[in-house]
Amino acid sequence: MANTPPTVLTFAATDPSTGAGVQADIMALSSIGCYPLSVITGITVQDTVGVESVMPLDADWINEQARTILEDVSVSAFKLGLLGSVENVAVIAEIVADYPDVPLIIDPILASGRGDELSNEEMQAAMCELLFPQATLITPNSLEARRLAYYDESDEVKHSSLEECALRLLGMGSEYVMITGTHERSNDVVNSLYGLQNGTPGLIKDYHWERLPGSYHGSGCTLTSAITACLAHGLTMEEAVHEAQEFTWQTLRHAFRPGMGQFIPDRFFWARESDVQEKASELQH
């Protein structure tokens, strides 16, 4: 019998386009050699253009799904995506609290790439107060970081630097914060990892990536799942963040456009590259 690969449990909503959501998590985790388990938090109506509606599942269903699989399978990490409701946030906080030694990676999704709202003030407060204190890493984009850092002081959002936001988020209890810069007006995309340096919270490293043309559906899900997968394989946080960004950038470089909306990251780009090389080799012989 083969050895069991690292197992990751993702809590996320569905996406019929497989660009984002639980389907994207499963693909990214599998591509990096993990075995994905999933708890469905909601059903969405969406395509590659945007999200039309979200139906959160009842919190009891979330609890039943998670408790049942966790009684059977040991997990190496938790990954959280779109949670759907305050009640779901609360029950998931209770679930992960029973596994304090398992890394908890949170992608705090507040809106779709098109700008469709997927959260509200009550959900944001619940995440900040119930989940972030338990988190190993949270991965907001710059817009989400500003909203979450000042969820109870909305007037401060527009006046704050991203570093100030990161420090406030670290103060909520997360061990690390990574703010992605795709929404910022910069030539390169700058992603910034924050955490404790010699006991003092602050910037650990800025990562600069070429800004690719186009708009992508599910890049955040891909990145956070990739970091989670790397941590499940035993990498340190800095190693995991670097490797996951490299993987995600490649998925975006190889992205395709199956519909009329955004591009979809190709989480199995390496498999198709291998196929091309193999076919080219066959032609040469």
What are these model-derived regions, one by one?
Residues A2-T10, I26-G113, E273-S274:
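Conserved N-terminal subdomain of the carbohydrate kinase-like
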Residues F11-S17, L203-H217:
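Short pre-catalytic strand/loop immediately N-terminal to key active-site residues, enriched for Gly-Thr
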Residues G33-L37, P201-K205, C230-A244:
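Phosphate-handling active-site elements
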Residues P56, E238-H285:
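Charged C-terminal helix
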Residues W61, E87-D101, C128, L196-D206, ...:
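Nucleotide and nucleotide-moiety/phosphate-recognizing core
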Residues E121-L203:
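Conserved phosphate/ATP/ADP-binding segment of small-molecule kinases
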Residues R146-R147, G214-M237:
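Short, small-residue alpha-helix embedded
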